[in-house]
Amino acid sequence: MDVRTLAVGKAHLEALLATRKMTLEHLQDVRHDATQVYFDGLEHLQNVAQYLAIPLSEFFVGQTQSDLDDGVKIARRNGGFKREEIRGGVHYYTYEHLVTTNQDPGLMALRLDLHSDDEQPLRLNGGHGSREIVYVTRGAVRVRWVGDNDELKEDVLNEGDSIFILPNVPHSFTNHVGGAKSEIIAINYG
């Protein structure tokens, strides 16, 4: 290992990435083994921290400057991270980050285009460690989740409807009408 190389625990970095709906595959130029992820010096790690909008101090004890400009940060259309979510061969979502800031790393706002409907097999996520509020901005959305008795629940949300989901509740959103495209805004926090 080079003297300049910085190591961050792999599980810790994966947890940070999960708050951004990302995986190690979404980072370029990082090496890793079973337990560590290696960065080519502090500048490399700072660039990754800035890209994720997560304070450098979340990676290790240190200081980071605010990414706000006079108390605000603006994210422009098509300027943020975007990825496709494929579950078991089914194209479920296109995730697009809304504004992220290192001043509130536990907050993740996403715009999602829904691609699946009842024609594809149901694929719930495994739940996640954050609370979630979802608002339907376009279309009609079928939401499914696992209830308290491990029973599959479902409902339909129309444009303007919203839902709150506790941490670790497996859930999924699909288009309610086959062939129609829906859009949701998801706010994950805490």
Curated annotation (Swiss-Prot):
Q: Which cofactor does it need?
A: Fe(2+)
Chain residues forming the annotated DNA-binding region: 20-40
Which UniProt keywords are given for this protein, alphabetically ordered? Antibiotic biosynthesis, Dioxygenase, DNA-binding, Iron, Metal-binding, NAD, Oxidoreductase
Sequence positions that bind Fe cation: H128, E132, H171
Matching InterPro entries = Cupin_2, RmlC-like_jellyroll, RmlC_Cupin_sf
Name the EC number(s): 1.11.1.23
Pathway(s) per entry = Antibiotic biosynthesis; fosfomycin biosynthesis
Task: Tell me where in this chain the HTH cro/C1-type domain is found.
Answer: 10-60
Q: Can you state which reaction this protein catalyses?
A: (S)-2-hydroxypropylphosphonate + H2O2 = (1R,2S)-epoxypropylphosphonate + 2 H2O
Question: Where along the chain is substrate bound?
Answer: R87, Y95, N125, G126, G127, H128, E132
Q: Which Gene3D superfamilies match?
A: Jelly Rolls (2.60.120.10)
What range(s) does the Cupin type-2 domain occupy?
128-176
Q: GO biological process annotations for this chain's record?
A: antibiotic biosynthetic process
Class of this enzyme:
oxidoreductase
Q: Which GO terms describe its molecular function?
A: dioxygenase activity; DNA binding; metal ion binding
Assembly: Homotrimer.
Q: Which family does it belong to?
A: Belongs to the non-heme iron-dependent dioxygenase family.
Protein's name according to its UniProt entry: (S)-2-hydroxypropylphosphonic acid epoxidase
Instruction: State the organism of origin.
Output: Pseudomonas syringae
Q: Which gene encodes it?
A: hppE
